[in-house]
């Protein structure tokens, strides 16, 4: 019947009397005669109206999703005060699975956050596979006990002795397919992914990884290729120590 209908509309939605990011404005109406109507100025506005409807549903709707529920009548006129509403996730120091990232994106969407600051690299890890530079993840994407860091980085942040991704959140990375999957998932929820690649500071994982690449290519007799992408200047004789105790 009409009371059970949900209508989605793209139109100029009325806005509260504040200075707002009007492109994401929406109106949510729950009416016993006409049903549920969500009107948004854009697709994002309609989407956010749907998120507000989810929040408005009684708890019974989640306890028994297939059972009928009574939805209280309401009219909501809403628009964001700030165009940029972000959340930051640091996976460089503590790796998170694709499934965990997607759960976070769902929570962001529910709270109408629209920018995901995805911290993919730092001193302690490089988490995005790059074609042609396997050491970035094979070396820079793993942490574990080591005497020379030639195969992987040393432990940090309680990552433990084992360098395998299955054993520690200090290890792991996203393949190209993983990353594209995350981008598509975010886009469907009107979230912009802002990848954060730290350079020139906070780049120790990349530096160590490129040193491993240089060693591999030199051992194969390709010194010229080994110099490409190297981040350490062998002629630099300066001495220093970082707050973490690193001198390389």
Residue spans of the language-model regions?
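Contiguous, structured surface segment used for ligand recognition
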Residues: 1-84
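Second-shell loop/turn segments in exported
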Residues: 36-40, 90-94, 168-172
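Conserved hydrophobic/aromatic pocket- or pore-lining residues that grip, position, or stack substrates
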Residues: 42, 108, 193
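Aromatic/hydrophobic pocket-lining residues that form the small-molecule binding cavity
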Residues: 46, 101, 175, 179
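Short, well-ordered coil/turn segments that N-cap beta-strands
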Residues: 83-85, 112-114, 187-193
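A conserved hydrophobic secondary-structure block that centers on an alpha-helix together
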Residues: 87-123, 127
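Generic beta-strand/beta-sheet core signal
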Residues: 90, 118-121, 194-202, 232
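Aromatic- and acidic-residue-enriched carbohydrate-binding clefts of CAZyme catalytic domains
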Residues: 124-188, 203-248
């Amino acid at each position: 019947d009409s009371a059970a209908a949900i209508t989605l509309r793209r139109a100029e939605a009325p806005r509260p009397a504040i200075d707002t990011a009007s492109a994401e404005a929406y109106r949510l109406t729950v009416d016993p005669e006409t049903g549920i109507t969500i009107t948004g100025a854009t697709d994002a506005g309609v989407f956010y109206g749907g998120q507000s409807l989810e929040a408005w549903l009684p708890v019974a709707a989640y306890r028994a999703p297939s059972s009928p529920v009574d939805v209280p009548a309401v009219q909501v006129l809403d628009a964001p005060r700030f165009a940029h509403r972000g959340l930051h996730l640091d996976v460089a120091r503590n790796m998170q699975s694709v499934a965990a990232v997607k759960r976070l994106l769902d929570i962001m969407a529910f709270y109408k956050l629209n920018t995901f600051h995805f911290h993919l690299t730092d001193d302690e890890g490089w988490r995005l596979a790059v074609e042609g530079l396997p050491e970035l993840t094979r070396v820079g994407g793993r942490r574990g006990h080591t005497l020379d860091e030639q195969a992987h980085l040393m432990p940090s942040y309680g990552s433990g002795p084992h360098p395998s991704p299955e054993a520690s959140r200090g290890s792991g990375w996203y393949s190209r397919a993983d990353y594209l999957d995350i981008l598509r998932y975010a886009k469907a929820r009107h979230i912009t992914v802002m990848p954060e690649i730290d350079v020139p500071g906070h780049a120790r994982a990349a530096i160590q990884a490129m040193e491993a690449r240089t060693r591999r290519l030199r051992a194969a007799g390709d010194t010229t290729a080994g110099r490409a992408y190297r981040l350490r200047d062998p002629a630099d004789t300066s001495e220093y120590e970082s707050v973490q105790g690193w001198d390389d």
